[in-house]
Amino acid sequence: MHSTNLLLEEPIRMASILEPSKPSFFPAMTKIVGTLGPKSRSVDTISSCLKAGMSVARFDFSWGDAEYHQETLENLKVAIKSTKKLCAVMLDTVGPELQVVNKSEASISLEENGTVILTPDQGQEASSQVLPINFAGLAKAVKPGDTIFVGQYLFTGSETTSVWLEVSQIKGDDVVCVIKNTATLAGSLFTLHCSQIHIDLPTLSDEDKEVIRKWGAPNKIDFLSLSYTRHVEDVRQAREFLSKLGDLSQTQIFAKIENVEGLNNFDEILQEADGIILSRGNLGIDLPPEKVFLFQKSALHKCNMAGKPAVVTRVVDSMTDNLRPTRAEATDVANAVLDGSDAILLGAETLRGLYPVETISIVGKICAEAEKVFNQDLYFKRTVKHVGEPMTHLESIASSAVRAAIKVKASVIICFTSSGRAARLIAKYRPTMPVLSVVIPRLKTNQLRWSFTGAFEARQSLIVRGLFPMLADPRHPAESTNATNESVLKVALDHGKVSGVIKSHDRVVVCQKVGDSSVVKIIELDD
Protein backbone atom coordinates (compact mmCIF):
# COMPACT_ATOMS: atom_id res chain seq x y z
CA MET A 1 0.00 0.00 0.00
CA HIS A 2 1.26 3.47 -0.83
CA SER A 3 1.98 5.84 2.03
CA THR A 4 0.08 9.07 2.54
CA ASN A 5 1.43 11.95 0.43
CA LEU A 6 2.35 14.06 3.45
CA LEU A 7 5.27 16.46 3.20
CA LEU A 8 7.47 15.85 6.23
CA GLU A 9 10.94 16.51 4.78
CA GLU A 10 10.95 20.08 6.11
CA PRO A 11 10.27 20.32 9.85
CA ILE A 12 7.20 22.44 10.50
CA ARG A 13 7.66 25.20 13.06
CA MET A 14 4.88 24.41 15.54
CA ALA A 15 4.09 28.08 16.20
CA SER A 16 3.37 28.54 12.47
CA ILE A 17 0.29 26.34 12.87
CA LEU A 18 -1.32 29.17 14.85
CA GLU A 19 -0.75 31.75 12.10
CA PRO A 20 -3.95 32.72 10.21
CA SER A 21 -4.29 31.36 6.68
CA LYS A 22 -3.99 33.76 3.76
CA PRO A 23 -7.32 34.58 2.07
CA SER A 24 -7.72 33.01 -1.37
CA PHE A 25 -10.21 33.40 -4.22
CA PHE A 26 -10.24 29.61 -4.61
CA PRO A 27 -11.17 28.20 -1.18
CA ALA A 28 -9.37 24.94 -1.98
CA MET A 29 -8.11 22.82 -4.88
CA THR A 30 -10.28 19.97 -3.58
CA LYS A 31 -13.86 20.33 -4.79
CA ILE A 32 -17.02 20.11 -2.68
CA VAL A 33 -20.24 18.40 -3.77
CA GLY A 34 -23.28 19.61 -1.82
CA THR A 35 -26.60 17.74 -1.65
CA LEU A 36 -29.44 20.24 -1.98
CA GLY A 37 -32.56 19.68 0.12
CA PRO A 38 -34.93 21.21 2.67
CA LYS A 39 -32.21 23.17 4.49
CA SER A 40 -30.31 24.27 1.38
CA ARG A 41 -32.73 24.97 -1.47
CA SER A 42 -33.50 28.70 -1.20
CA VAL A 43 -31.74 31.10 -3.58
CA ASP A 44 -29.99 32.86 -0.69
CA THR A 45 -28.70 29.64 0.88
CA ILE A 46 -27.54 28.19 -2.45
CA SER A 47 -25.78 31.49 -3.25
CA SER A 48 -23.98 31.30 0.09
CA CYS A 49 -23.05 27.66 -0.59
CA LEU A 50 -21.54 28.64 -3.96
CA LYS A 51 -19.55 31.47 -2.37
CA ALA A 52 -18.38 29.10 0.38
CA GLY A 53 -16.93 26.69 -2.20
CA MET A 54 -19.60 24.30 -3.51
CA SER A 55 -18.92 23.52 -7.18
CA VAL A 56 -21.28 20.56 -7.77
CA ALA A 57 -24.93 20.40 -6.68
CA ARG A 58 -26.25 16.89 -6.03
CA PHE A 59 -29.94 16.05 -6.47
CA ASP A 60 -30.90 12.89 -4.61
CA PHE A 61 -34.04 11.19 -5.93
CA SER A 62 -34.30 8.76 -3.01
CA TRP A 63 -36.75 11.34 -1.65
CA GLY A 64 -38.77 14.22 -3.13
CA ASP A 65 -40.46 14.26 -6.53
CA ALA A 66 -39.31 15.77 -9.83
CA GLU A 67 -41.33 18.95 -9.29
CA TYR A 68 -39.66 19.57 -5.91
CA HIS A 69 -36.18 19.07 -7.37
CA GLN A 70 -37.01 21.24 -10.38
CA GLU A 71 -37.86 24.14 -8.07
CA THR A 72 -34.51 23.67 -6.32
CA LEU A 73 -32.70 23.55 -9.68
CA GLU A 74 -34.35 26.78 -10.83
CA ASN A 75 -33.17 28.40 -7.58
CA LEU A 76 -29.66 27.09 -8.31
CA LYS A 77 -29.72 28.73 -11.76
CA VAL A 78 -30.70 32.07 -10.21
CA ALA A 79 -27.91 31.71 -7.61
CA ILE A 80 -25.34 30.91 -10.34
CA LYS A 81 -26.29 34.07 -12.23
CA SER A 82 -26.19 36.29 -9.16
CA THR A 83 -22.86 34.93 -7.83
CA LYS A 84 -21.28 34.43 -11.28
CA LYS A 85 -19.95 31.06 -10.11
CA LEU A 86 -20.26 27.95 -12.25
CA CYS A 87 -21.86 24.89 -10.70
CA ALA A 88 -22.36 21.41 -12.16
CA VAL A 89 -25.44 19.23 -11.57
CA MET A 90 -25.28 15.63 -10.35
CA LEU A 91 -28.30 13.31 -10.35
CA ASP A 92 -28.09 10.51 -7.77
CA THR A 93 -30.07 7.37 -8.59
CA VAL A 94 -31.92 5.25 -6.03
CA GLY A 95 -30.80 1.90 -7.45
CA PRO A 96 -31.35 -1.31 -5.44
CA GLU A 97 -31.71 0.60 -2.18
CA LEU A 98 -33.88 -1.07 0.46
CA GLN A 99 -36.21 1.47 2.06
CA VAL A 100 -38.83 1.78 4.78
CA VAL A 101 -41.34 4.60 4.20
CA ASN A 102 -42.61 6.01 7.49
CA LYS A 103 -45.84 7.63 6.26
CA SER A 104 -46.86 9.01 9.65
CA GLU A 105 -43.33 10.39 10.28
CA ALA A 106 -43.84 9.50 13.96
CA SER A 107 -40.68 8.44 15.82
CA ILE A 108 -40.26 4.67 16.17
CA SER A 109 -38.65 3.39 19.37
CA LEU A 110 -36.83 0.04 19.27
CA GLU A 111 -35.59 -1.65 22.45
CA GLU A 112 -32.48 -3.81 22.73
CA ASN A 113 -33.22 -7.59 22.71
CA GLY A 114 -36.76 -6.95 21.44
CA THR A 115 -38.01 -8.18 18.05
CA VAL A 116 -39.20 -6.41 14.91
CA ILE A 117 -40.62 -7.85 11.68
CA LEU A 118 -39.45 -6.71 8.22
CA THR A 119 -42.35 -7.26 5.81
CA PRO A 120 -42.86 -6.58 2.08
CA ASP A 121 -46.49 -5.64 2.84
CA GLN A 122 -46.21 -1.88 2.26
CA GLY A 123 -49.84 -1.41 3.21
CA GLN A 124 -48.84 -1.70 6.86
CA GLU A 125 -47.83 1.34 8.92
CA ALA A 126 -44.24 1.48 10.15
CA SER A 127 -44.10 0.86 13.91
CA SER A 128 -41.88 -0.56 16.64
CA GLN A 129 -43.28 -4.02 15.78
CA VAL A 130 -43.30 -3.92 11.95
CA LEU A 131 -41.17 -2.18 9.32
CA PRO A 132 -42.60 -2.45 5.74
CA ILE A 133 -39.85 -2.61 3.10
CA ASN A 134 -39.82 -2.08 -0.69
CA PHE A 135 -38.33 -5.51 -1.57
CA ALA A 136 -40.37 -8.72 -1.71
CA GLY A 137 -37.33 -10.98 -1.97
CA LEU A 138 -35.65 -10.21 1.36
CA ALA A 139 -36.84 -13.47 2.98
CA LYS A 140 -35.10 -15.44 0.21
CA ALA A 141 -31.90 -13.37 0.36
CA VAL A 142 -31.14 -13.59 4.09
CA LYS A 143 -30.77 -16.41 6.62
CA PRO A 144 -30.75 -16.60 10.44
CA GLY A 145 -27.63 -14.95 11.85
CA ASP A 146 -27.31 -12.35 9.07
CA THR A 147 -26.90 -8.69 10.08
CA ILE A 148 -29.16 -5.87 8.85
CA PHE A 149 -28.59 -2.16 9.49
CA VAL A 150 -31.50 0.31 9.58
CA GLY A 151 -31.03 4.07 9.83
CA GLN A 152 -32.57 7.38 8.90
CA TYR A 153 -32.01 8.18 5.23
CA LEU A 154 -28.46 9.58 4.96
CA PHE A 155 -27.86 8.26 8.47
CA THR A 156 -25.06 9.85 10.46
CA GLY A 157 -24.03 6.67 12.24
CA SER A 158 -25.24 7.69 15.67
CA GLU A 159 -26.36 4.58 17.55
CA THR A 160 -29.32 6.44 19.02
CA THR A 161 -30.78 7.08 15.55
CA SER A 162 -29.82 3.82 13.81
CA VAL A 163 -30.23 0.19 14.71
CA TRP A 164 -28.50 -3.14 14.12
CA LEU A 165 -30.75 -6.17 13.62
CA GLU A 166 -29.90 -9.87 13.57
CA VAL A 167 -32.12 -12.21 11.55
CA SER A 168 -33.65 -14.80 13.91
CA GLN A 169 -36.15 -16.56 11.65
CA ILE A 170 -37.93 -16.45 8.29
CA LYS A 171 -41.75 -16.59 8.27
CA GLY A 172 -42.99 -16.78 4.69
CA ASP A 173 -42.15 -13.40 3.11
CA ASP A 174 -41.48 -11.82 6.52
CA VAL A 175 -38.11 -11.62 8.28
CA VAL A 176 -38.14 -11.67 12.09
CA CYS A 177 -35.16 -9.86 13.65
CA VAL A 178 -33.67 -9.39 17.11
CA ILE A 179 -32.85 -5.75 17.96
CA LYS A 180 -29.17 -5.41 18.95
CA ASN A 181 -29.24 -1.85 20.32
CA THR A 182 -31.84 0.58 21.66
CA ALA A 183 -32.61 3.32 19.12
CA THR A 184 -35.23 5.81 17.98
CA LEU A 185 -35.80 5.98 14.22
CA ALA A 186 -36.91 9.47 13.18
CA GLY A 187 -37.95 10.90 9.82
CA SER A 188 -40.04 9.84 6.83
CA LEU A 189 -37.54 7.51 5.16
CA PHE A 190 -35.25 4.81 6.56
CA THR A 191 -32.74 2.73 4.61
CA LEU A 192 -31.74 -0.89 5.16
CA HIS A 193 -28.34 -2.35 4.44
CA CYS A 194 -27.83 -6.12 4.53
CA SER A 195 -24.18 -6.79 5.28
CA GLN A 196 -22.45 -8.73 2.46
CA ILE A 197 -25.73 -10.02 0.97
CA HIS A 198 -26.65 -9.85 -2.73
CA ILE A 199 -29.92 -8.01 -3.37
CA ASP A 200 -31.52 -9.14 -6.62
CA LEU A 201 -32.67 -5.73 -7.86
CA PRO A 202 -31.45 -3.84 -10.98
CA THR A 203 -28.77 -1.19 -10.46
CA LEU A 204 -30.67 1.20 -12.74
CA SER A 205 -34.34 0.67 -11.91
CA ASP A 206 -37.32 1.57 -14.10
CA GLU A 207 -38.03 4.46 -11.70
CA ASP A 208 -34.44 5.70 -12.14
CA LYS A 209 -34.77 5.56 -15.93
CA GLU A 210 -38.02 7.51 -15.78
CA VAL A 211 -36.40 10.23 -13.64
CA ILE A 212 -33.38 10.45 -15.96
CA ARG A 213 -35.63 10.60 -19.03
CA LYS A 214 -38.11 13.16 -17.69
CA TRP A 215 -35.88 15.25 -15.38
CA GLY A 216 -32.26 14.54 -16.24
CA ALA A 217 -32.50 14.91 -20.02
CA PRO A 218 -34.36 18.27 -20.14
CA ASN A 219 -31.97 19.66 -17.53
CA LYS A 220 -28.84 18.31 -19.28
CA ILE A 221 -27.29 16.86 -16.12
CA ASP A 222 -23.49 16.84 -16.00
CA PHE A 223 -23.02 13.77 -13.81
CA LEU A 224 -24.98 10.61 -13.06
CA SER A 225 -24.15 9.09 -9.68
CA LEU A 226 -24.85 5.38 -10.24
CA SER A 227 -25.80 4.08 -6.79
CA TYR A 228 -24.80 0.55 -5.76
CA THR A 229 -22.60 -0.11 -8.81
CA ARG A 230 -21.72 -3.80 -8.48
CA HIS A 231 -20.33 -4.83 -11.88
CA VAL A 232 -18.75 -3.16 -14.91
CA GLU A 233 -21.89 -4.14 -16.85
CA ASP A 234 -23.90 -1.75 -14.64
CA VAL A 235 -21.88 1.18 -15.98
CA ARG A 236 -22.10 -0.03 -19.58
CA GLN A 237 -25.87 -0.40 -19.40
CA ALA A 238 -26.23 3.07 -17.87
CA ARG A 239 -24.04 4.56 -20.61
CA GLU A 240 -26.05 2.81 -23.32
CA PHE A 241 -29.24 4.23 -21.80
CA LEU A 242 -27.82 7.77 -21.64
CA SER A 243 -26.55 7.57 -25.24
CA LYS A 244 -30.16 7.37 -26.44
CA LEU A 245 -31.14 10.60 -24.66
CA GLY A 246 -29.59 13.26 -26.89
CA ASP A 247 -27.34 15.60 -24.89
CA LEU A 248 -27.01 13.05 -22.07
CA SER A 249 -24.56 11.12 -24.25
CA GLN A 250 -22.05 13.64 -22.81
CA THR A 251 -23.10 13.04 -19.18
CA GLN A 252 -20.33 11.50 -17.11
CA ILE A 253 -21.08 8.40 -15.03
CA PHE A 254 -19.67 8.20 -11.51
CA ALA A 255 -19.83 4.66 -10.15
CA LYS A 256 -20.82 4.63 -6.49
CA ILE A 257 -19.02 1.83 -4.66
CA GLU A 258 -21.26 0.89 -1.72
CA ASN A 259 -20.80 -2.82 -1.04
CA VAL A 260 -18.47 -5.81 -1.25
CA GLU A 261 -19.64 -6.67 -4.79
CA GLY A 262 -18.50 -3.27 -6.04
CA LEU A 263 -15.23 -3.60 -4.13
CA ASN A 264 -14.49 -7.01 -5.68
CA ASN A 265 -15.06 -5.63 -9.20
CA PHE A 266 -13.41 -2.26 -8.54
CA ASP A 267 -10.67 -2.43 -11.21
CA GLU A 268 -13.07 -3.27 -14.05
CA ILE A 269 -15.58 -0.63 -12.90
CA LEU A 270 -12.83 2.01 -12.73
CA GLN A 271 -11.84 1.35 -16.35
CA GLU A 272 -15.39 1.91 -17.61
CA ALA A 273 -16.65 4.71 -15.32
CA ASP A 274 -15.74 8.41 -15.68
CA GLY A 275 -15.18 8.71 -11.93
CA ILE A 276 -15.68 6.91 -8.62
CA ILE A 277 -17.65 7.79 -5.48
CA LEU A 278 -16.48 5.96 -2.37
CA SER A 279 -19.72 5.61 -0.41
CA ARG A 280 -18.15 5.02 2.96
CA GLY A 281 -21.47 4.96 4.81
CA ASN A 282 -22.82 1.73 3.35
CA LEU A 283 -19.39 0.28 2.61
CA GLY A 284 -18.44 0.86 6.23
CA ILE A 285 -21.23 -1.54 7.18
CA ASP A 286 -20.03 -4.25 4.79
CA LEU A 287 -16.38 -3.94 5.82
CA PRO A 288 -14.83 -4.53 9.25
CA PRO A 289 -13.95 -1.10 10.75
CA GLU A 290 -10.22 -1.87 10.69
CA LYS A 291 -10.35 -2.41 6.89
CA VAL A 292 -12.10 0.83 5.86
CA PHE A 293 -8.90 2.93 5.74
CA LEU A 294 -7.17 0.29 3.60
CA PHE A 295 -9.96 0.37 1.02
CA GLN A 296 -9.94 4.18 0.94
CA LYS A 297 -6.19 4.50 0.40
CA SER A 298 -6.05 1.71 -2.19
CA ALA A 299 -9.11 2.91 -4.14
CA LEU A 300 -7.96 6.55 -4.21
CA HIS A 301 -4.49 5.52 -5.39
CA LYS A 302 -5.99 3.49 -8.25
CA CYS A 303 -8.22 6.43 -9.26
CA ASN A 304 -5.26 8.84 -9.16
CA MET A 305 -3.09 6.63 -11.36
CA ALA A 306 -5.97 6.16 -13.82
CA GLY A 307 -6.48 9.95 -13.92
CA LYS A 308 -10.13 9.63 -12.93
CA PRO A 309 -11.82 11.82 -10.29
CA ALA A 310 -12.45 10.20 -6.91
CA VAL A 311 -15.07 11.49 -4.48
CA VAL A 312 -15.17 10.63 -0.77
CA THR A 313 -18.41 10.73 1.25
CA ARG A 314 -19.40 10.82 4.93
CA VAL A 315 -16.72 13.04 6.44
CA VAL A 316 -18.42 15.47 8.84
CA ASP A 317 -21.59 13.70 9.95
CA SER A 318 -21.69 15.52 13.29
CA MET A 319 -22.08 18.88 11.49
CA THR A 320 -25.64 17.85 10.61
CA ASP A 321 -26.51 19.14 14.08
CA ASN A 322 -23.34 20.91 15.26
CA LEU A 323 -21.45 23.99 14.13
CA ARG A 324 -18.01 22.35 14.46
CA PRO A 325 -16.77 18.95 13.31
CA THR A 326 -15.22 16.53 15.79
CA ARG A 327 -11.43 16.29 15.95
CA ALA A 328 -11.61 12.88 14.26
CA GLU A 329 -13.74 14.29 11.42
CA ALA A 330 -11.42 17.26 10.84
CA THR A 331 -8.48 14.86 10.61
CA ASP A 332 -10.50 12.55 8.35
CA VAL A 333 -11.15 15.34 5.83
CA ALA A 334 -7.44 16.21 5.74
CA ASN A 335 -6.45 12.56 5.31
CA ALA A 336 -8.93 12.17 2.43
CA VAL A 337 -7.12 15.06 0.69
CA LEU A 338 -3.66 13.60 1.40
CA ASP A 339 -4.84 10.18 0.20
CA GLY A 340 -5.73 11.72 -3.18
CA SER A 341 -9.42 12.62 -3.14
CA ASP A 342 -10.58 15.04 -5.85
CA ALA A 343 -13.77 16.03 -4.08
CA ILE A 344 -15.64 15.72 -0.80
CA LEU A 345 -19.35 14.88 -1.00
CA LEU A 346 -21.65 16.26 1.69
CA GLY A 347 -24.98 14.47 2.16
CA ALA A 348 -27.06 14.88 5.30
CA GLU A 349 -24.80 17.78 6.35
CA THR A 350 -26.23 20.04 3.61
CA LEU A 351 -29.52 18.28 2.79
CA ARG A 352 -31.10 18.43 6.24
CA GLY A 353 -28.25 19.78 8.34
CA LEU A 354 -28.64 22.95 10.37
CA TYR A 355 -25.43 24.55 9.05
CA PRO A 356 -25.03 23.81 5.31
CA VAL A 357 -23.02 26.94 4.46
CA GLU A 358 -20.74 26.69 7.50
CA THR A 359 -20.12 23.01 6.74
CA ILE A 360 -18.98 23.76 3.18
CA SER A 361 -16.79 26.60 4.42
CA ILE A 362 -15.10 24.57 7.18
CA VAL A 363 -14.53 21.52 4.95
CA GLY A 364 -13.00 23.81 2.31
CA LYS A 365 -10.64 25.37 4.86
CA ILE A 366 -9.51 21.95 6.11
CA CYS A 367 -8.89 20.83 2.51
CA ALA A 368 -6.85 23.97 1.78
CA GLU A 369 -4.63 23.41 4.83
CA ALA A 370 -4.06 19.76 3.91
CA GLU A 371 -3.10 20.74 0.36
CA LYS A 372 -0.26 22.90 1.72
CA VAL A 373 1.51 19.82 3.11
CA PHE A 374 0.79 17.53 0.15
CA ASN A 375 4.08 16.07 -1.09
CA GLN A 376 3.68 16.90 -4.77
CA ASP A 377 7.25 15.96 -5.68
CA LEU A 378 6.85 12.41 -4.39
CA TYR A 379 3.41 12.11 -5.99
CA PHE A 380 4.70 13.41 -9.36
CA LYS A 381 7.57 10.89 -9.47
CA ARG A 382 5.24 8.05 -8.52
CA THR A 383 2.72 9.02 -11.23
CA VAL A 384 5.38 9.33 -13.95
CA LYS A 385 6.78 5.93 -12.96
CA HIS A 386 3.30 4.39 -13.12
CA VAL A 387 2.61 5.84 -16.59
CA GLY A 388 5.89 4.39 -17.85
CA GLU A 389 7.62 4.96 -21.18
CA PRO A 390 7.04 5.78 -23.91
CA MET A 391 4.43 8.29 -22.77
CA THR A 392 1.62 9.32 -25.08
CA HIS A 393 2.04 12.73 -26.69
CA LEU A 394 -0.66 14.35 -24.54
CA GLU A 395 0.59 12.73 -21.32
CA SER A 396 4.10 14.01 -22.02
CA ILE A 397 2.85 17.56 -22.60
CA ALA A 398 0.73 17.48 -19.43
CA SER A 399 3.53 16.22 -17.17
CA SER A 400 5.99 18.70 -18.73
CA ALA A 401 3.60 21.60 -18.08
CA VAL A 402 3.31 20.65 -14.40
CA ARG A 403 7.05 20.13 -13.96
CA ALA A 404 7.80 23.48 -15.64
CA ALA A 405 5.22 25.30 -13.51
CA ILE A 406 6.73 23.94 -10.30
CA LYS A 407 10.32 24.68 -11.37
CA VAL A 408 9.59 28.34 -12.22
CA LYS A 409 7.14 28.74 -9.30
CA ALA A 410 4.30 29.72 -11.64
CA SER A 411 1.19 31.14 -10.02
CA VAL A 412 -1.16 29.34 -12.40
CA ILE A 413 -1.25 26.94 -15.36
CA ILE A 414 -3.50 28.02 -18.23
CA CYS A 415 -4.65 25.20 -20.49
CA PHE A 416 -6.60 25.70 -23.71
CA THR A 417 -8.83 22.72 -24.39
CA SER A 418 -11.91 21.71 -26.37
CA SER A 419 -12.68 18.30 -24.90
CA GLY A 420 -11.27 18.99 -21.44
CA ARG A 421 -8.94 15.98 -21.71
CA ALA A 422 -5.70 17.97 -21.73
CA ALA A 423 -6.71 19.92 -18.62
CA ARG A 424 -7.71 16.71 -16.79
CA LEU A 425 -4.34 15.15 -17.63
CA ILE A 426 -2.55 18.17 -16.16
CA ALA A 427 -4.69 17.87 -13.03
CA LYS A 428 -3.73 14.19 -12.80
CA TYR A 429 -0.19 15.27 -11.82
CA ARG A 430 -1.56 17.32 -8.89
CA PRO A 431 0.20 20.68 -9.52
CA THR A 432 0.55 22.92 -6.48
CA MET A 433 -1.05 25.84 -8.32
CA PRO A 434 -4.56 26.19 -9.85
CA VAL A 435 -5.13 25.06 -13.43
CA LEU A 436 -7.27 27.50 -15.38
CA SER A 437 -9.03 25.35 -17.96
CA VAL A 438 -10.01 27.60 -20.87
CA VAL A 439 -12.62 25.68 -22.85
CA ILE A 440 -12.67 26.71 -26.52
CA PRO A 441 -16.23 26.20 -27.89
CA ARG A 442 -16.68 24.33 -31.14
CA LEU A 443 -19.43 25.04 -33.63
CA LYS A 444 -21.51 22.04 -34.69
CA THR A 445 -24.65 21.60 -36.79
CA ASN A 446 -27.38 19.00 -37.33
CA GLN A 447 -28.30 20.58 -40.70
CA LEU A 448 -31.21 22.40 -39.02
CA ARG A 449 -29.44 24.64 -36.51
CA TRP A 450 -26.01 25.57 -35.20
CA SER A 451 -24.92 25.02 -31.63
CA PHE A 452 -21.73 25.35 -29.61
CA THR A 453 -20.09 22.61 -27.58
CA GLY A 454 -18.08 23.39 -24.47
CA ALA A 455 -20.54 24.01 -21.63
CA PHE A 456 -20.60 20.33 -20.59
CA GLU A 457 -16.81 20.11 -20.71
CA ALA A 458 -16.41 23.23 -18.59
CA ARG A 459 -18.86 22.15 -15.89
CA GLN A 460 -17.51 18.60 -15.75
CA SER A 461 -14.09 19.88 -14.70
CA LEU A 462 -15.74 21.31 -11.56
CA ILE A 463 -15.34 17.93 -9.83
CA VAL A 464 -11.63 17.55 -10.66
CA ARG A 465 -9.07 18.68 -8.08
CA GLY A 466 -7.34 21.93 -9.03
CA LEU A 467 -9.28 22.59 -12.25
CA PHE A 468 -11.10 25.92 -12.54
CA PRO A 469 -12.93 26.32 -15.87
CA MET A 470 -13.84 29.34 -17.92
CA LEU A 471 -15.68 29.37 -21.25
CA ALA A 472 -13.77 31.21 -23.97
CA ASP A 473 -15.46 33.56 -26.42
CA PRO A 474 -15.51 31.67 -29.76
CA ARG A 475 -15.05 34.97 -31.62
CA HIS A 476 -11.58 35.47 -30.20
CA PRO A 477 -8.50 33.59 -31.44
CA ALA A 478 -6.62 31.44 -28.92
CA GLU A 479 -3.74 33.89 -29.20
CA SER A 480 -3.64 37.34 -30.79
CA THR A 481 -1.79 37.77 -34.07
CA ASN A 482 -1.17 41.45 -33.39
CA ALA A 483 -1.24 43.84 -30.48
CA THR A 484 -4.71 45.18 -31.25
CA ASN A 485 -6.55 41.82 -31.25
CA GLU A 486 -8.12 40.75 -28.00
CA SER A 487 -6.99 37.16 -27.45
CA VAL A 488 -8.40 34.38 -25.33
CA LEU A 489 -5.06 34.30 -23.50
CA LYS A 490 -5.43 37.95 -22.48
CA VAL A 491 -8.99 37.29 -21.30
CA ALA A 492 -7.75 34.30 -19.28
CA LEU A 493 -4.94 36.35 -17.74
CA ASP A 494 -7.35 39.16 -16.88
CA HIS A 495 -9.70 36.61 -15.30
CA GLY A 496 -6.79 35.32 -13.22
CA LYS A 497 -5.89 38.85 -12.12
CA VAL A 498 -9.46 39.68 -11.11
CA SER A 499 -9.63 36.36 -9.26
CA GLY A 500 -6.49 37.25 -7.35
CA VAL A 501 -4.43 34.23 -8.44
CA ILE A 502 -2.25 36.21 -10.88
CA LYS A 503 -0.28 39.33 -9.91
CA SER A 504 2.25 41.59 -11.64
CA HIS A 505 5.60 39.89 -12.41
CA ASP A 506 4.09 36.44 -11.85
CA ARG A 507 5.11 33.59 -14.12
CA VAL A 508 2.38 31.66 -15.88
CA VAL A 509 2.67 28.38 -17.76
CA VAL A 510 0.49 28.15 -20.86
CA CYS A 511 -0.41 24.86 -22.54
CA GLN A 512 -2.02 25.13 -25.98
CA LYS A 513 -2.11 23.80 -29.52
CA VAL A 514 -0.45 25.84 -32.27
CA GLY A 515 -1.30 24.28 -35.61
CA ASP A 516 -0.65 20.56 -35.26
CA SER A 517 1.80 21.01 -32.39
CA SER A 518 1.20 21.13 -28.64
CA VAL A 519 3.20 23.86 -26.94
CA VAL A 520 4.14 24.52 -23.31
CA LYS A 521 5.46 28.02 -22.76
CA ILE A 522 6.34 30.19 -19.79
CA ILE A 523 5.37 33.85 -19.76
CA GLU A 524 6.32 36.52 -17.23
CA LEU A 525 3.79 39.28 -16.68
CA ASP A 526 4.62 42.97 -16.79
CA ASP A 527 3.13 45.56 -14.45
UniProtKB/Swiss-Prot annotation:
What residues correspond to the site Transition state stabilizer? 256
Keyword terms, alphabetized: ATP-binding, Cytoplasm, Glycolysis, Kinase, Magnesium, Metal-binding, Nucleotide-binding, Potassium, Pyruvate, Transferase
Q: Name one GO biological process term.
A: glycolytic process
Task: Name the residues that bind substrate.
Answer: 58, 256, 281-282, 313
Q: Which GO terms describe its cellular component?
A: cytoplasm; cytosol
Q: In which pathway does it act?
A: Carbohydrate degradation; glycolysis; pyruvate from D-glyceraldehyde 3-phosphate: step 5/5
Q: What is its main location?
A: cytoplasm
What positions does the entry give for K(+) binding?
A: 60, 62, 92-93
Q: Name one GO molecular function term.
A: magnesium ion binding
List cofactor names only.
Answer: Mg(2+); K(+)
Q: Which parts of the sequence bind ATP?
A: 60-63
Role summary: Key regulatory enzyme of the glycolytic pathway that catalyzes the final step of glycolysis, converting ADP and phosphoenolpyruvate (PEP) to ATP and pyruvate by essentially irreversible transphosphorylation.
Subunit structure of this chain's protein: Homotetramer.
From the Swiss-Prot or TrEMBL record, give the protein name: Pyruvate kinase 2, cytosolic
**Species in which this protein is naturally found:** Oryza sativa subsp. japonica (Rice)
> What is the organism lineage in this UniProt record?
Eukaryota, Viridiplantae, Streptophyta, Embryophyta, Tracheophyta
